[in-house]
């Protein structure tokens, strides 16, 4: 029988413990917890003065990031003072930061608010986060921003003290730390001097006007704020054009560039490129090869590899049209429906081998009644056969096709991903073969031919005693050829549309619904279409109104129209004298 070990009293060590669960901590427990829970971290892409995403970033020599417009307004109100540390700061001490960004953004507000894209390392293209060690390499009045891992691996350890972007020399003293995950206290909002003194976040003049007008602060919305700003600018532009009597529906032919004084214009370091239709999900590997071999020309762009027509079509769910083939045997003909949508490689292999006559004269070497019949091996041993690529190809189990009925056509194999040229027809549903053999077709006509094959006697090794030969396989409808024709037709149609667009568009594009034709300069002119409504009324009026000469008017007598007498109304009249 055991004894209890829990003491009925509190020990000295438990009473004097310094943690929050000590009985001696008293009422200070909640106060200590509140002090540790009040930590607020400024995101790396936020201005330290406005506490909002920056547009044109600059930094101080100690690595504090500001927006150039915001810090300019602050220094006008508080000359020679850093809002974060309170130390002396002048405009000439600010360093312009060159951030790189990718072409597309996956997160709200992750990039600069005046353009699209996430902030990235310009060499490795890794997206910056709040946990990335970010540094800047200073070159006078500007600095290029990198991840610390890139600079440490390619500059410091390699002893190559040249900037990886513009090839400028630098020293270790030129490296400025913008964000260090191990030193989160440097971005703690509770330590900012201007917040301790009760000052509010500094805003630009434009942001102050928006706040006074009660509008939404678009800068705090990230990429959504850009759309709001563009919509508001378009409405304001249309209102001004309407006041000046201009045509608000006319498209602008020129874009004006903002020329704000003291604003640092930062151009995108990566150009947007429209990917080709047959672009792969992986790159050509030239950048990796040039980094690892000095014998290759340096390459920094992650160019996408291009797929061939065959590789492009052999992606699942690319070619969705079904194909048809006729298998001619000495027992009769079988009409087969092929499914390239879910098994494109198996269907392509079967069609190409059939078109080259690979299956002509090939016998079915294995026949098991109430199970299946197998063929496709020119050697007839069951151990031969070769695919159209000359090697095994992978299984395709992602589709919904299963061995759910008689006449199912599947690939025979020796194990996982060992498909070649052999195939088999199922005599009955065989669900135990699902996800073991690729289903790529089914018999849709002359299913009774399978019954004739099933009734052929076999020897002890399931080999038919009477040969069942494949005379030929005729492809009635090639889905891949049809896909290529449709693709070429679509490309030709797209080129024609682009050609017409460059020439100014069609007649329908040049004419509005009111019948006005749009000129090349954007103005409008009336056409005959504008007079289509009511044009016959003018002709009728002209025909019904005869022309009168002034000489004829002299012989016509004129008279005054007699004054019409007022009709007396019946009834009782006025009742005033009653």
Curated annotation (Swiss-Prot):
U-box domain span: 40-114
Ranges of biased composition (kind: Acidic residues): 551-560
GO molecular function: peptidyl-prolyl cis-trans isomerase activity; ubiquitin protein ligase activity
Xref: InterPro entries: Cyclophilin-like_dom_sf, Cyclophilin-type_PPIase_CS, Cyclophilin-type_PPIase_dom, Cyclophilin_A-like, PPIL2_U-box_dom, Ubox_domain, Znf_RING/FYVE/PHD
Catalytic activity as recorded in UniProt: [protein]-peptidylproline (omega=180) = [protein]-peptidylproline (omega=0); S-ubiquitinyl-[E2 ubiquitin-conjugating enzyme]-L-cysteine + [acceptor protein]-L-lysine = [E2 ubiquitin-conjugating enzyme]-L-cysteine + N(6)-ubiquitinyl-[acceptor protein]-L-lysine
Gene3D superfamilies: Cyclophilin-like, Zinc/RING finger domain, C3HC4 (zinc finger)
GO BP field: protein folding; protein polyubiquitination
EC assignment: 2.3.2.27, 5.2.1.8
Any one cellular-component term (Gene Ontology): catalytic step 2 spliceosome
Biased composition (Gly residues): 569-578
Region listing for Disordered, in residue ranges: 240-260, 505-578
Main location: nucleus
Subcellular localization(s) per the UniProt record: Nucleus
Pathway: Protein modification; protein ubiquitination
Entry superkingdom: Eukaryota
Segments of skewed composition (Polar residues): 538-548
Keywords: Isomerase, Nucleus, Rotamase, Transferase, Ubl conjugation pathway
Domain PPIase cyclophilin-type: 321-475
Entry's family note: Belongs to the cyclophilin-type PPIase family. PPIL2 subfamily.
Function: May catalyze the cis-trans isomerization of proline imidic peptide bonds in oligopeptides thereby assisting the folding of proteins. May also function as a chaperone, playing a role in intracellular transport of proteins. May also have a protein ubiquitin ligase activity acting as an E3 ubiquitin protein ligase or as a ubiquitin-ubiquitin ligase promoting elongation of ubiquitin chains on proteins.
Protein name: Peptidyl-prolyl cis-trans isomerase-like 2
Organism: Gibberella zeae (strain ATCC MYA-4620 / CBS 123657 / FGSC 9075 / NRRL 31084 / PH-1) (Wheat head blight fungus)
């Amino acid at each position: 029988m055991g004894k209890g070990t829990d003491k009925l009293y509190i020990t000295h060590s438990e009473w004097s413990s310094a943690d929050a669960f000590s009985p001696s901590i008293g009422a200070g427990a909640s106060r200590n917890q509140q002090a540790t829970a009040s930590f607020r971290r400024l995101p790396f892409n936020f201005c330290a003065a406005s506490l909002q995403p920056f547009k044109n970033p600059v930094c101080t020599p100690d690595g504090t990031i500001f927006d150039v417009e915001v810090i300019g307004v602050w220094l006008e109100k508080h000359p020679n003072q850093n809002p974060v540390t309170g130390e002396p700061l002048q405009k000439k001490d600010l360093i312009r930061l060159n951030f790189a960004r990718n072409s597309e953004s996956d997160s709200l507000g992750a990039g600069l608010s005046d353009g699209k894209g996430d902030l990235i390392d310009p060499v490795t293209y890794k997206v910056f986060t709040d946990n990335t060690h970010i540094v800047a390499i200073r070159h006078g009045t500007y600095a290029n921003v990198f991840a610390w891992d890139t600079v440490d691996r390619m500059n410091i350890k390699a002893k190559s003290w040249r900037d990886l972007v513009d090839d400028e020399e630098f020293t270790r003293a030129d490296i400025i730390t913008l964000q260090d995950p191990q030193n989160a206290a440097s971005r703690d909002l509770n330590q900012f001097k201007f917040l301790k003194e009760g000052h509010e976040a500094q805003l630009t003049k434009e942001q102050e006007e928006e706040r006074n007008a009660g509008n939404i602060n678009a800068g705090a919305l990230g990429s959504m704020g850009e759309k709001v700003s563009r919509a508001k600018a378009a409405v304001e532009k249309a209102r001004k054009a309407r006041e000046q009597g201009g045509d608000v529906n006319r498209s602008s032919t020129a874009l004006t560039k903002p020329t704000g004084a003291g604003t640092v214009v930062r151009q995108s370091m990566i150009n947007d490129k429209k990917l080709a239709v047959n672009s792969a999900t992986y790159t050509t590997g030239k950048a990796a090869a040039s980094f690892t071999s000095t014998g290759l020309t340096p390459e920094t762009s992650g160019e996408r590899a291009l797929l061939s027509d065959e590789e492009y079509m052999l992606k699942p769910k690319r070619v969705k049209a079904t194909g048809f083939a006729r298998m001619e045997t000495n027992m009769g003909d079988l009409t087969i429906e092929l499914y390239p949508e879910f098994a494109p490689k198996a269907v392509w292999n079967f069609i190409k081998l059939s078109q080259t006559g690979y299956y002509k004269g090939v016998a079915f070497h294995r026949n098991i009644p109430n199970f299946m019949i197998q063929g496709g091996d020119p050697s007839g041993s069951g151990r031969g056969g070769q695919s159209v690529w000359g090697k095994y190809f992978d299984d395709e189990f992602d589709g919904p096709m299963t061995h759910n009925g008689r006449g199912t056509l599947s690939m025979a194999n020796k194990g996982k991903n060992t498909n070649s040229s052999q195939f088999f027809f199922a005599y009955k549903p065989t669900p135990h073969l699902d996800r073991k053999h690729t289903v790529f077709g089914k018999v849709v006509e002359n299913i009774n031919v399978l019954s004739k094959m099933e009734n052929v006697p076999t020897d002890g090794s399931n080999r038919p005693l009477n040969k069942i030969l494949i005379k030929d396989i005729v492809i009635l409808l090639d889905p891949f050829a049809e896909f290529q024709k449709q693709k070429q037709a679509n490309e030709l149609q797209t080129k024609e549309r682009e050609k017409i667009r460059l020439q100014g568009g069609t007649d329908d594009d040049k004419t509005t619904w009111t019948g006005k034709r749009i000129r090349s300069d954007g103005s409008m002119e009336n056409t005959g279409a504008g007079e289509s409504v009511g044009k016959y009324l003018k002709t009728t009026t002209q025909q019904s109104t005869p022309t009168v000469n002034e000489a004829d008017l002299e012989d016509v007598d004129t008279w005054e129209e007699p004054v019409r007498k007022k009709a007396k109304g019946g009834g009782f009249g006025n009742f005033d004298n009653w």
